[in-house]
Every structure is written in C-alpha cells, then in structure tokens.
C-alpha cells in the first residue's frame, strides 16, 4: 500500500510562501506615530530592500525622495505624448511618479521633521520632487547615509550594500 502525504519539496514551498506573505503583511502595516528612530530606519531599510529587489526583477529605475519629515519611493516612467516635459527637466521623455506596489507601503513619515540625508562626496541635500537617491535595475544606488535626529543612522554604498558602521557612505 502506498503512503500518502506531502513531499519535502512541497513543505519547503509552503514555508517559503508563508514567509513571503508574512513579509508583505508587515510592510503593509501603516507607520505608527510613536516609532523609535531605530524602528523608523528599519522600516525605511525594509522598504528600500523591497524596491531594490523589484528593480532586479522588473528592470525599472527607482528613486527615493527624502524630506525632513517624510520619504517617498518613486518609479521612472515614460512620458506620454500629451504630457509635455518641463523646460528644466533633465529626464527628457521620462518622469518620476510615486511608486504604487499594491498593499506594500512605499513611503513613510515622521513627526517633527528630523530626517537628514548625507552623500558620500559631500554634495548638498536639497529636498524636492525629484529623487535624492537613485536605485538602478542592477541593485546599485547612490551612496548615502540617512539619520533620524541624534540616533545612529543607516548607510549604503554604491553597490546597494548596507554599511555595518554608521559612517559616511562610500
């Protein structure tokens, strides 16, 4: 008589799907207003990793627009013929739009406006509508360091790797 049951491969696939589902659920929760700096930066890093992986899968360019009180992930889309490009736009034929990723949060905000973005080469940070950090389809990104108030920040190098020590991005 033949035994019936699940194979090891089927069990591993179920565990993988449960893990991915749990991760998506956690990213979909709205930000609580009393987050600590470490929690806020961890949420930003999780969103950044999600967008980085999405870029690897889809081949799209993404960006992050950082303001003192919030951040927003953006996607580079082709302009349609009815949408003229502004005269000072360096993205001829393309425009940055807020990223919509289903139920996954692609933005965040904090009370009090304490976010600070620093670049490896010492470039000045001027918050605006265009992205401050570019995320390329291969996973590379603009090197940066993000801090929240006086707490230690997070830093990433040009390869998109998190730097272990909170130091100037390389």
UniProtKB/Swiss-Prot annotation:
Subcellular location: Cell inner membrane
Membrane topology reported for the UniProt record: Single-pass membrane protein
Record InterPro entries: N_methyl_site (IPR012902), Pilin-like (IPR045584), T2SS_protein-GspH (IPR002416), TypeII_GspH (IPR049875)
Biological processes per GO annotation: protein secretion by the type II secretion system
Cellular component terms per the entry's GO annotation: plasma membrane; type II protein secretion system complex
Pfam entry (one): N_methyl
Membrane-spanning parts: 6-29
Chief localisation class: membrane
Modification after translation (UniProt): Cleaved by prepilin peptidase. Methylated by prepilin peptidase at the amino group of the N-terminal phenylalanine once the leader sequence is cleaved by prepilin peptidase.
Subunit description: Type II secretion is composed of four main components: the outer membrane complex, the inner membrane complex, the cytoplasmic secretion ATPase and the periplasm-spanning pseudopilus. Interacts with core component PulG.
Name of the molecule in the record: Type II secretion system protein H
């Amino acid at each position: 008589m033949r035994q019936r049951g699940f194979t090891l491969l089927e069990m591993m696939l179920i565990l993988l799907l449960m893990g991915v589902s749990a991760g998506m659920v956690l990213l979909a929760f709205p930000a609580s207003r009393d987050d600590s700096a470490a929690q806020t930066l961890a949420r930003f890093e999780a969103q950044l990793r999600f967008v980085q992986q999405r870029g690897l899968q889809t081949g799209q360019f993404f960006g992050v627009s950082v303001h003192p009180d919030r951040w927003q992930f953006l996607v580079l889309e082709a302009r349609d013929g009815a949408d003229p490009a502004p005269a000072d736009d360096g993205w001829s034929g393309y425009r940055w739009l807020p990223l919509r990723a289903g139920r996954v949060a692609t933005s965040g905000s904090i009370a009090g406006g304490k976010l600070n973005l620093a670049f490896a080469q010492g470039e000045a940070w001027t918050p605006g509508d265009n992205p401050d950090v570019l995320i390329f389809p291969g996973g590379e990104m603009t090197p940066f360091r993000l801090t929240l108030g006086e707490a230690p920040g997070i830093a990433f190098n040009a390869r998109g790797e998190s730097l272990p020590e909170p130091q100037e991005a390389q």
